[in-house]
């Protein structure tokens, strides 16, 4: 389907439900939007398991206004796309084939950038590892860089059962079946059938993660962080101090930015945000400057890497005491310091001038409940009572 609409002062050509062929014969469903005109445009690609939407999302208008095409695509096995959903393995090759398809379209100039958060950020990392020549830069947000530690297991091998089963239940319960309540499956035993309790069916992805409870070669091969040397495209990562994946985001940046590498093209920004990037968090505000113009950063980033925009490009918007343009071209780190509630530019992670402080766990013998008397203290006490509790995985 083809139609034209208007995004602000720019007319938009709409190509809805375009079938994108993959190497194995599967077709993915995509919506394409680009400025009306006879020229070719660089493209912004968004690949999502959550539904690309039925029409033109107003939130992408600024890309159209700045001369980009926007491609929104349902990943394999989700919504309008064919195939079986395989989150651990599909996004690299499917993204690679999609990039080739975009480059071959009459409205494309062959240059593509990718954006998106959480799973949509993982999809960017996956294809960035494959070094498709059409992918010029990525902008992953709250995505993390290691599936084992970010999404499935804690250090030491305890499964993040609630985190994972909730996501599976919310997203992979078949249409027509009611979504079970969290309490009905979080305590389900045996673990081998918890996927059925949560979604009404056996899931290959869940069975696979049960087979790999330790950080073995399976997880290392999947890990972005472990394979970061394969990433050649410029990366602008965004994380939140209250997000599950912030440590992993910082680890990926540190690996990209380590001495001896071509680290001048990578950036990271960490703000006082949880996974959904909202503020205030838990009722605590961090001042008027705690937000960030993410879309302005994205446009500046892609104007530079997809269009070769000069440093003095006039349309970059000043923000607080710095400019978006300067952030793209200069300091590799932009972090929000809570307490003083201001942004600060840095050039390495961990910070070389860090002074590490030890904290100690203590109690009066009753730190064994959610309302216990456990505390963090500055000094290690000479004597403390033990805390005891009975663990039963069935209760």
Give the label of every model feature segment:
Residues 247-266:
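Active-site-adjacent alpha-helix of alpha/beta-hydrolase-fold enzymes
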Residues 35-104, 146, 151-154, 159, ...:
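Cap/lid segment of the alpha/beta-hydrolase catalytic domain
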Residues 231, 237-239:
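Short beta-strand/loop motif that positions the catalytic acidic residue
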Residues 106-119:
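Alpha/beta-hydrolase fold nucleophile elbow
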Residues 65, 129-230, 312-313:
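Accessory cap/linker subdomain of secreted extracellular hydrolases
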Residues 3-38:
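N-terminal cap/lid segment of alpha/beta-hydrolase-fold proteins
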Residues 186-192, 283-395:
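C-terminal, loop-rich substrate-recognition/catalytic regions characterized by aromatic stacking residues
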Residues 114-116, 141, 238:
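Short beta-strand immediately N-terminal to the catalytic nucleophile in serine-hydrolase-like folds
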């Amino acid at each position: 389907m083809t139609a034209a609409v208007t995004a602000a002062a720019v007319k938009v050509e709409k190509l809805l439900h375009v079938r994108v062929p993959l190497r194995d014969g599967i077709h993915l469903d995509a919506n394409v939007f680009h400025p009306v005109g006879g020229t070719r445009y660089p493209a912004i690609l968004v690949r999502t398991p959550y539904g690309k939407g039925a029409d033109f999302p107003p939130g992408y208008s600024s890309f159209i206004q700045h001369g980009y095409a926007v491609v929104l695509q349902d990943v394999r096995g989700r919504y309008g796309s064919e195939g079986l959903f395989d989150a651990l393995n599909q996004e690299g090759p499917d993204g690679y084939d999609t990039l080739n398809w975009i480059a071959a379209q009459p409205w494309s100039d062959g240059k593509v950038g990718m954006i998106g958060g959480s799973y949509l950020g993982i999809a960017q990392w996956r294809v960035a590892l494959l070094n498709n020549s059409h992918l010029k830069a990525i902008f992953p947000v709250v995505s993390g860089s290691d599936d084992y530690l970010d999404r499935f297991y804690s250090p030491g091998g305890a499964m993040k059962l609630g985190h994972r089963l909730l996501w599976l239940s919310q997203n992979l319960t078949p249409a027509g079946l009611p979504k079970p309540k969290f309490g009905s499956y979080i305590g389900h035993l045996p673990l081998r059938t918890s996927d059925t309790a949560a979604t009404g069916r056996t899931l290959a992805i869940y069975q696979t993660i049960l087979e790999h409870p330790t950080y073995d070669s399976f997880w290392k091969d999947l890990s972005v962080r472990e394979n970061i040397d394969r990433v050649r495209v410029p990366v602008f990562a965004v994380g939140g101090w209250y997000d599950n994946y912030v440590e992993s985001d910082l680890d990926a940046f540190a690996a990209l930015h380590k001495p001896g590498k071509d680290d001048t093209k990578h950036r990271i920004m960490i703000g006082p945000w949880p996974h959904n990037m909202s503020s205030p968090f838990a009722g605590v505000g961090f001042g008027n400057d705690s937000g960030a113009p993410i879309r302005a950063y994205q446009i500046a980033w892609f104007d530079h890497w997809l269009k070769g925009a000069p440093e003095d490009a006039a349309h970059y918007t000043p923000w607080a005491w710095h400019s978006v343009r300067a952030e793209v071209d200069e300091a590799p780190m932009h972090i929000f310091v809570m307490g003083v509630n201001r942004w600060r530019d840095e050039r390495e992670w961990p910070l070389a001038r860090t002074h590490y402080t030890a904290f100690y766990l203590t109690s009066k013998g009753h730190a064994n409940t959610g309302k216990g008397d456990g505390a963090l203290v500055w000094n290690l006490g000479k004597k403390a009572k033990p805390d005891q509790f009975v663990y039963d995985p069935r209760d």
